[in-house]
Amino acid sequence: MYRPLVARLLRDSVATRKGSSHFARRFSHSLPFATVDAEELSGAKPAEVLNLVQGNWGGSSSWHTVVDPLNGEPFIKVAEVDETEIKPFVESLSKCPKHGLHNPFKSPERYLLYGDISTKAGHMLSIPKVSEFFARLIQRVAPKSYHQALGEVQVTQKFFENFTGDQVRFLARSFGVPGNHLGQQSNGFRWPFGPVAIITPFNFPLEIPVLQLMGALYMGNKPLLKVDSKVSIVMEQMMRLLHYCGLPVGDADFVNSDGKAMNKILLEANPRMTLFTGSSRVAEKLALDLKGRIKLEDAGFDWKILGPDVNEADYVAWVCDQDAYACSGQKCSAQSILFMHENWAATPLISRLKELAERRKLEDLTVGPVLTVTTEAMLDHLNKLLQIPGAKLLFGGKPLENHTIPSIYGAVKPTAVYVPLEEILKVSNYELVTKEIFGPFQVVTEYKNSQLPMVLEALERMHAHLTAAVVSNDQLFLQEVIGNTVNGTTYAGLRARTTGAPQNHWFGPAGDPRGAGIGTPEAIKLVWSCHREIIYDIGPVSHHWEIPPST
């Protein structure tokens, strides 16, 4: 199915392109869908990010400049629409009916179309030149190690592979229940919302928007996608790849804007459902503005508990380091607080964590710029924590050295601060200690067997319930902790982690009816479709039937 596409890609890669400057630019990088070269992005060769609406790519009246997070050089110009330019996007969404672009009774062949698109897109991302392109582009705008960036591409590829062939139409599987009499039967269907919106953050420029965009499209919706402008170049290029793989250009719109303009689009277009991934503050505002027509995957102050059984100390330390500091802690699933059983506190765990954290360096981006929290803000938070009685700095707590990261971003060494459990629970301290710092920063504390109820109390009082880890193979301990907590994605066992949002299991919060999942069939059906019941009652009516008395 995808062989002609791949052959075309390879043929285009070696062909000499002539003609207009557009095509020279478009194909100069040997990838027929690409309009940029990740390696060449610079102030001297800035890239441009456009908008897509009603099947056409276009600019705006003004350009927003994105600076290189590693050196501060302006290197990307984003065509951000302002409040006077939103009409085409509002009209485009408004043209989509509530019953969607397809549903089980309308254009069912489009389920097969999206199976084909997924097949082609998955294979495209398996081509080393293509996966390298996206991994490097991610690194340029959301600096993380190459391993982390490539992992994001690979998860996206596997997601596409999961929804090839008939798998898209299987998402719309219905059921039937026998009725009360001959000719009656009730049938349940998954139904699209129609016009929808997707808003995604900077930290996963490819994985989050692709998985949510495709989920929306699979179920028959028409989405308007907005990605944080700092990183939207990645998804703009992915949209072009999807068009190359057969995505109809009018099926999805792509907009660059600030929050104010996007909010106005939502209020005027009135999408039937909006998916928001990002900060809790914005999430709560949108929930009010959109009158509840929203699904959220917002901030997470994610916890890890080390149980009483101490095993594989080096492995556990390595996972803790990865959970807290990979991507410079800029994951919504990053380990924010570590509860150590006293048995673990008696081991060299903290010194091992310190050694692992100190291996991280800017040169390979195992630590790097923090895009939403400044250095001053992180150090100020640290200093406030250190005012708590018994608190102490375990490691880090200093700015990165010898760098050119602009001051609008953060640059600190991986940091851990110890706060006594008794102090954490105090009303005067709790909100401070559990404030999410979206950077390489974690709180560490210790507990005894008798203090497990205190740990559970601390978890119960948290507001966000995204990911969690219970590191123990003690079945009774696991049962106690899992039974008294709520986090939507909870890893349990010796190898438990807080991070890792692959395509093979649910990732999302629990405990909130607005909670959104991502990636799996269950998540797609929950977020991007609703239940519709159709009751057939075709008769026959008995020949002996008579009009009964009124009731």
From Swiss-Prot:
<dbReference type="GO" id="GO:0004029">
    <property type="term" value="F:aldehyde dehydrogenase (NAD+) activity"/>
</dbReference>
<dbReference type="InterPro" id="IPR016161">
    <property type="entry name" value="Ald_DH/histidinol_DH"/>
</dbReference>
<dbReference type="InterPro" id="IPR016160">
    <property type="entry name" value="Ald_DH_CS_CYS"/>
</dbReference>
<feature type="binding site">
    <location>
        <begin position="278"/>
        <end position="283"/>
    </location>
    <ligand>
        <name>NAD(+)</name>
    </ligand>
</feature>
<comment type="function">
    <text>Could be involved in facilitating the biotrophic relationship between the plant and the rust fungus.</text>
</comment>
<feature type="site" description="Transition state stabilizer">
    <location>
        <position position="203"/>
    </location>
</feature>
<feature type="active site" description="Nucleophile">
    <location>
        <position position="332"/>
    </location>
</feature>
<protein>
    <recommendedName>
        <fullName>Probable aldehyde dehydrogenase</fullName>
        <ecNumber>1.2.1.3</ecNumber>
    </recommendedName>
</protein>
<feature type="active site" description="Proton acceptor">
    <location>
        <position position="297"/>
    </location>
</feature>
<dbReference type="Pfam" id="PF00171">
    <property type="entry name" value="Aldedh"/>
</dbReference>
<keyword id="KW-0560">Oxidoreductase</keyword>
<dbReference type="GO" id="GO:0010133">
    <property type="term" value="P:proline catabolic process to glutamate"/>
</dbReference>
<comment type="similarity">
    <text>Belongs to the aldehyde dehydrogenase family.</text>
</comment>
<keyword id="KW-0520">NAD</keyword>
<dbReference type="InterPro" id="IPR016163">
    <property type="entry name" value="Ald_DH_C"/>
</dbReference>
<dbReference type="InterPro" id="IPR015590">
    <property type="entry name" value="Aldehyde_DH_dom"/>
</dbReference>
<dbReference type="GO" id="GO:0005739">
    <property type="term" value="C:mitochondrion"/>
</dbReference>
<dbReference type="InterPro" id="IPR044638">
    <property type="entry name" value="ALDH7A1-like"/>
</dbReference>
<dbReference type="GO" id="GO:0003842">
    <property type="term" value="F:1-pyrroline-5-carboxylate dehydrogenase activity"/>
</dbReference>
<dbReference type="InterPro" id="IPR016162">
    <property type="entry name" value="Ald_DH_N"/>
</dbReference>
